[in-house]
Amino acid sequence: MKTLYSLRRFYPVETLFNGTLALAGRDQETTGFAWWAGNARLINLSGKLLGAHVAHAGLIVFWAGAMNLFEVAHFVPEKPMYEQGLILLPHLATLGWGVGPGGEVVDTFPYFVSGVLHLISSAVLGFGGIYHALLGPETLEESFPFFGYVWKDRNKMTTILGIHLILLGLGAFLLVFKALYFGGVYDTWAPGGGDVRRITNLTLSPSIIFGYLLKSPFGGEGWIVSVDDLEDIIGGHVWLGSICILGGIWHILTKPFAWARRAFVWSGEAYLSYSLGALSVFGFIACCFVWFNNTAYPSEFYGPTGPEASQAQAFTFLVRDQRLGANVGSAQGPTGLGKYLMRSPTGEIIFGGETMRFWDLRAPWLEPLRGPNGLDLSRLKKDIQPWQERRSAEYMTHAPLGSLNSVGGVATEINAVNYVSPRSWLATSHFVLGFFFFVGHLWHAGRARAAAAGFEKGIDRDFEPVLFMTPLN
């Protein structure tokens, strides 16, 4: 049966050149969308849309498992993770699997298990996706009303939202349980250079947890990205998990209020735009987190942050020149400021030279040398440990700088090595994805609002100016 043209006129339709590509219920004639419009053809086919999403999840999980095993197969335990271009194993190591003191990998078997579990899961999801895409019912409303839905049904939509929030909350609690009861997580701040430990003293004070949200995003404040101890991170996940679960229950039990019914557009494309907007925000936050934060993303696995590599260089040369007899407390640099040490705008003693701009840095290899007024001169003279020297020399030569052709390091460095920090990869990719998702959010929000208002933006093809122009030849 052909859909009435009046029901299809709100969709800009491209002509399908090859009419033989039609699939029953999924062709241009019935849906108003050509084959390349992807899931738009399935807007009103909940069963087929389920298949598309399950299959997509299968592809994602397959990538995770395959890439995980690829990284395990190429992993060299003697080299730091960040020197090997790894982006998945650092996450597993951060969760405390397979690592010991100082972030040294002692066992790769947990990484292998993770990869295999993801591959098996992807097979299950792949089978489910193919089943629902090809064999299962086209729509779920008749046979499985609990899983069926109509996009305009506001109550059902908020119920689905609630279920998703509960699942997200449970995900947050998985991290909490891992940190509290199942072996702990890697703490880069553990004495002597980092270790896996169980978190025993959670931060649950709302003034501390929500204080992060009220901080300025700039400079030494750094909003939530400034978190620098695991108690706060795990405590934050307790709060977040609880809020998500309670919010989920609320959305399942209630119907949207009148103001919410008026404020939102209630259509599939509108929900897509809201989701893309949220994911865009997540992408930008993740970008800042992986670039600046060395607690949630320990430098032992991801390499140093930019400020950390810079401060490490200043520290390394302070150590060298102090051994050669320099008085690091009073030596003057070429600008008349301190060559090795100077004062920050608020009076603390900080590293001098170009790295002064990064005086906010906190890092586990440096903090033991601070006193109440910044860097402590007597500690710098007497208390520097070999592990601190080794780590700063390592970080100094592995700054998160690099180009697309994988030649890492400062652009003017003639001895550049084949190194690009995982921080560079993860921060850049999440920024780019966040940007594209934001553009997608604007695109789909505009279309959804236009459809709700009863018109589509675009040129009326019947009166297109080009049709009245003389042919060029």
Curated annotation (Swiss-Prot):
One BP annotation, GO: photosynthetic electron transport in photosystem II
Cofactor: binding comment: Binds multiple chlorophylls and provides some of the ligands for the Ca-4Mn-5O cluster of the oxygen-evolving complex. It may also provide a ligand for a Cl- that is required for oxygen evolution. PSII binds additional chlorophylls, carotenoids and specific lipids.
Nucleotide-binding listed as a keyword: no
Domain of life: Eukaryota
Modified positions (Phosphothreonine) in chain numbering: 15
TM spans (from-to): 69-93, 134-155, 178-200, 255-275, 291-312, 447-471
Cellular localisation: Plastid, Chloroplast thylakoid membrane
Keyword annotations: Acetylation, Chlorophyll, Chloroplast, Chromophore, Manganese, Membrane, Metal-binding, Phosphoprotein, Photosynthesis, Photosystem II, Plastid, Thylakoid, Transmembrane, Transmembrane helix
GO CC list: chloroplast thylakoid membrane; photosystem II
Propeptide: 1-14
Keyword flag Chloroplast: yes
MF GO annotations: chlorophyll binding; electron transporter, transferring electrons within the cyclic electron transport pathway of photosynthesis activity; metal ion binding
Residues the entry annotates as binding [CaMn4O5] cluster: 367
Modification sites for N-acetylthreonine: 15
Gene3D superfamilies linked to this entry: photosystem ii from thermosynechococcus elongatus (1.10.10.670)
One Pfam family in the UniProt entry: PSII
Recorded topology in the membrane: Multi-pass membrane protein
Protein family: Belongs to the PsbB/PsbC family. PsbC subfamily.
Known role: One of the components of the core complex of photosystem II (PSII). It binds chlorophyll and helps catalyze the primary light-induced photochemical processes of PSII. PSII is a light-driven water:plastoquinone oxidoreductase, using light energy to abstract electrons from H(2)O, generating O(2) and a proton gradient subsequently used for ATP formation.
Subunit structure: PSII is composed of 1 copy each of membrane proteins PsbA, PsbB, PsbC, PsbD, PsbE, PsbF, PsbH, PsbI, PsbJ, PsbK, PsbL, PsbM, PsbT, PsbX, PsbY, PsbZ, Psb30/Ycf12, at least 3 peripheral proteins of the oxygen-evolving complex and a large number of cofactors. It forms dimeric complexes.
Protein name (database record): Photosystem II CP43 reaction center protein
Annotated source species: Nuphar advena
